[in-house]
Amino acid sequence: MKKLAQLVLATGLLTTACAASAQGLTAAQARAAIAPWYSLFNQPVEGDMKTLQEQVLTADYESCWGYLPGECWGRDASIKVVGGFAKSIPDMKFEIKEVLVAGDRVIVRGEVTGTPAGDLFGVPHTGKSFRIMAIDIQTIRDGKIARTYHLENWLSALGQLRAK
């Protein structure tokens, strides 16, 4: 009887997992949802940055950067952060290198390049450029990004900017 109960439970879990997977995003849907977000990093600030972000981020969007536990900010703060990068690294580019899809989650491996226009994170301006890796895990809801967990290798960027 115990084995039968375990089999029924396992079958139920497998069925639930398969149903959730079947309802997941396609690769095309995932790229369509994330591409506008990354394009914000690849262009000079033109037009209303807030309107652009509201088109791709849910109203309750959270950006979690992972350096401190529970360190997340909402859509309005994210708008300020992206605008700040556009000013401090005007030639910043984010190139999507790889996209993996798991249900409503989209994992993006990207490469960030740029040349700071002034001091960056306390490193004096040198005119040098950097190239770093970034990993993002995006949760998509109703075609928009609802949450982002992201890590960028800023330590490497600072090392490149300080190099002799």
Region spans (language model):
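A short, structured loop/turn motif at beta-sheet edges
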Residues: 99-107, 139-146
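Exposed beta-sheet edge and beta->alpha loop/turn motif
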Residues: 111-141
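Bacterial N-terminal signal peptides that target proteins for export
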Residues: 1-8
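Short acidic-aromatic low-complexity motifs
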Residues: 24-60
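A solvent-exposed, acidic/Ser-Thr-rich amphipathic alpha-helical stretch
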Residues: 50-103
